[in-house]
Amino acid sequence: MAAARVLRTWSQNAVRLTCVRYFQTFNSARVLKPKCVCSVGYPLFKYSQPRHSLRTAAVLQGQVVQFKLSDIGEGIREVTIKEWYVKEGDTVSQFDSICEVQSDKASVTITSRYDGVIKRLYYNLDDIAYVGKPLIDIETEALKDSEEDVVETPAVSHDEHTHQEIKGQKTLATPAVRRLAMENNIKLSEVVGSGKDGRILKEDILSFLEKQTGAILPPSPKSEITPPPPQPKDRTFPTPIAKPPVFTGKDRTEPVTGFQKAMVKTMSAALKIPHFGYCDEIDLTQLVKLREELKPVALARGIKLSFMPFFLKAASLGLLQFPILNASVDENCQNITYKASHNIGIAMDTELGLIVPNVKNVQVRSVFEIAMELNRLQKLGSSGQLGTTDLTGGTFTLSNIGSIGGTYAKPVILPPEVAIGALGAIKALPRFDQKGDVYKAQIMNVSWSADHRVIDGATMSRFSNLWKSYLENPAFMLLDLK
């Protein structure tokens, strides 16, 4: 009888158990974790959807947070503040430029990760900032208190949940790469990164953009090309360099920063390399004529054509025959790594100092494509805007010291590379032809330096002879172009 009374009471007062959803907040995103919602009645157990809605208030985010300098990559631990784009009291949005910093390898624009008001700048111009340390204080915008209806939805399947987690993975990319993607309306989730741990590099963005839009302009019809009239060659005089101001007071001491600091590291390491030199003379008479014919064609396509694209392409063809010159050695010279890509560096003299950006994959580029890339690097280099990707990864280097003046040089190898060439000025000099007649020749001298631990003189000489043959007879390059 007692059991019957208990059963009757249970049937009259059905027990309803409700397990409520709860919320956890990670950063600024609210993640819903559902618990089961069920009702228990007699004599049948069944699952049902709740008919009510839960209400929650948005998290108030009006607080001052420290914006720390993120890891820029390439082992960079400190940078110099070159320019502030904001000041205290300014209002910024996500991806707005905060400042321009310069490391010993590249210049990088730092962008905001928050919407808010700048409360404090931790550094002045030319101060040294360290990775992981606060850069600015920013008061994030407060979200107005609001209540949101939470609509109950069926449980998400395991496959869907896994897919969402993959989508939510963090994309590895530097602020400069993210800004480049944003300026070109590219979603980083659609780009496959080729860097370490899937990091998206600037090359990946440019490659993705080229696939979407195409980067090479079609050649212009010959009928539209109007070569500029030849200009009279006046005698030029060197422009006198302005004398530095004379300091009559105390001596001045400045820290070594930026590209100068990079030169200290690189040249100190280069002292450990036993250099040997090799020089030769190149007759560029035929190449000078060919360039004069192609200059208006390239100009019609919007590209300034110099001699360097020909020098780089000839060097790449030579490296295919002598891959040891496109190799690198480890610190103790115990291992040699033969590089598949010909990333040929070009030494540039800029207001910021000596920089050596490199043209990637010269072995698969045409002379015109090399000229396009050189134009881009020169524009960025003159304004101090070269990125880390442009300044790293070189495998072989040419230095055009002749553009400033000089005939010979003793170039210093850039570790871990094993060879470098210095190009002198092109001069009109008398030479004898095969018949013994004197003619006006366009002569350039080249000075090579190589790592004598792994390169012998015969190898350097054979490479130089092959490179020379391509430049003295440009038509020969057509036989080996791929």
Curated annotation (Swiss-Prot):
Co-factor remark: Binds 1 lipoyl cofactor covalently.
Transmembrane regions listed in the UniProt entry: none
Region ranges (Disordered): 217-252
Amino acid composition bias (Pro residues), ranges on this chain: 218-231
Residues that bear N6-succinyllysine: K133, K196, K261, K289, K440
PTM sites of type Phosphoserine: S220
Cofactor dependence: (R)-lipoate
Residues annotated as the enzyme's active site: H452, D456
UniProt cross-references to InterPro entries, sorted A to Z: 2-oxoA_DH_lipoyl-BS (IPR003016), 2-oxoacid_DH_actylTfrase (IPR001078), 2-oxoacid_DH_E2_comp (IPR050743), Biotin_lipoyl (IPR000089), CAT-like_dom_sf (IPR023213), E3-bd_dom_sf (IPR036625), PSBD (IPR004167), Single_hybrid_motif (IPR011053)
Cellular component aspect of the GO annotation: branched-chain alpha-ketoacid dehydrogenase complex; cytosol; microtubule cytoskeleton; mitochondrial nucleoid; mitochondrion
PROSITE patterns the UniProt entry points to: BIOTINYL_LIPOYL (PS50968), LIPOYL (PS00189), PSBD (PS51826)
UniProt entry tagged with the keyword Repressor: no
UniProt-annotated location(s): Mitochondrion matrix
Keywords: Acetylation, Acyltransferase, Lipoyl, Mitochondrion, Phosphoprotein, Transferase, Transit peptide
Span list, region Critical for association with PPM1K: 145-160
Enzyme class at the top of the EC tree: transferase
Entry keyword Cell inner membrane: no
Origin: domain of life: Eukaryota
Transit peptide, residues from-to: 1-61
EC number: 2.3.1.168
N6-acetyllysine: residues carrying this PTM: K196, K202, K243, K250, K289, K295, K304, K435, K440
Enzymatic reactions: N(6)-[(R)-dihydrolipoyl]-L-lysyl-[protein] + 2-methylpropanoyl-CoA = N(6)-[(R)-S(8)-2-methylpropanoyldihydrolipoyl]-L-lysyl-[protein] + CoA
Function: The branched-chain alpha-keto dehydrogenase complex catalyzes the overall conversion of alpha-keto acids to acyl-CoA and CO(2). It contains multiple copies of three enzymatic components: branched-chain alpha-keto acid decarboxylase (E1), lipoamide acyltransferase (E2) and lipoamide dehydrogenase (E3). Within this complex, the catalytic function of this enzyme is to accept, and to transfer to coenzyme A, acyl groups that are generated by the branched-chain alpha-keto acid decarboxylase component.
Subunit structure: Forms a 24-polypeptide structural core with octahedral symmetry that represents the E2 component of the branched-chain alpha-ketoacid dehydrogenase (BCKDH) complex. The BCKDH complex is composed of three major building blocks E1, E2 and E3. It is organized around E2, a 24-meric cubic core composed of DBT, to which are associated 6 to 12 copies of E1, and approximately 6 copies of the dehydrogenase E3, a DLD dimer.
Family: Belongs to the 2-oxoacid dehydrogenase family.
Protein name as catalogued: Lipoamide acyltransferase component of branched-chain alpha-keto acid dehydrogenase complex, mitochondrial
Originating species: Mus musculus
